Amino acid sequence: MNDRVYWIWLQQVLGISTSIRTDEIVAYFGNAKALYHAGEYEWRISGVFNPRQISKLNNQDLTKAKNIFDSCVKNNWQTVTPDDENYPSMLFRLPNFPLVLYVNGDLDCLKNKITVAIVGTREPTRNSACIARALSASITRSGGLI
């Protein structure tokens, strides 16, 4: 079985949460396949997971993860995981880095770039939208990635 299926399973089971430290998961278990096969005892003594998360990890059905992976292959989408050499190294600086990146296009755009995230309200004022547009245009013209 492709190791990416285990990463997809882990992302699906745990979901996206700020209480999950993916850096601790990878530091302790190394990869998603090792975590999958470690079992509940090891999950508990690792100190990485709370009881609710351990309960979720006990759902070891890989069917949904396999279907997601197969859909990605069918559509020529890349699945990039932390154990891939082309996983963006800058993401490892985050304590809660993504377990799977779903890529449609060229992932190289993330390498050696200044990256900026612009966060705002769903209903910005006209002035703040204008400022955000001007800032993002200036950053991208200078070679940055938003």
Predicted feature locations:
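Short, positively charged patches
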Residues: 1-137, 141
